[in-house]
């Protein structure tokens, strides 16, 4: 079920504080580390780089205009795909 039209997009207040602080100090090239994977990417985040925590490390995410409206967690995978193991039978010639 999608979010109600009456509600604004969710973005954690501490993420907004960190963005406003970085813009005020003119640190647009620095990485802003966040844990809030459920926050929606807003228009004011375009051009900034965020370090989104995936449970182990901070994955750098450079925000562009195609990402607006999506969540930070979509760009920071938490699971590692190891692939299917090949057949271990020895082939005879």
Swiss-Prot record:
Q: Does the keyword RNA-binding apply?
A: yes
Any GO molecular function: rRNA binding
- Keyword set includes Translocase: no
Q: Which residues form a coiled coil?
A: none
Functional description taken from the UniProt entry: Protein S19 forms a complex with S13 that binds strongly to the 16S ribosomal RNA.
Per the UniProt entry, what are the Gene Ontology biological process annotations, in alphabetical order?
ribosomal small subunit assembly; translation
Alphabetically list the UniProt keywords: Ribonucleoprotein, Ribosomal protein, RNA-binding, rRNA-binding
- State the name under which the record lists this protein: Small ribosomal subunit protein uS19
The UniProt entry, under SUPFAM superfamilies, shows: Ribosomal protein S19
Output the Gene Ontology cellular-component terms.
Answer: cytoplasm; small ribosomal subunit
């Amino acid at each position: 079920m999608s979010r109600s039209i009456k509600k604004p997009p969710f973005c954690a207040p501490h993420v907004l504080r960190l963005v406003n602080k970085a813009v005020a100090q003119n640190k647009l090239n620095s990485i802003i580390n966040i844990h809030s994977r459920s926050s929606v990417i807003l228009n004011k985040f375009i051009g900034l780089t965020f370090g989104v925590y995936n449970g182990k490390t901070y994955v750098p995410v450079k925000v562009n205009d195609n990402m607006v409206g999506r969540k930070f967690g979509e760009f920071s995978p938490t699971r590692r795909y190891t692939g299917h193991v090949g057949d271990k039978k020895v082939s005879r010639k």
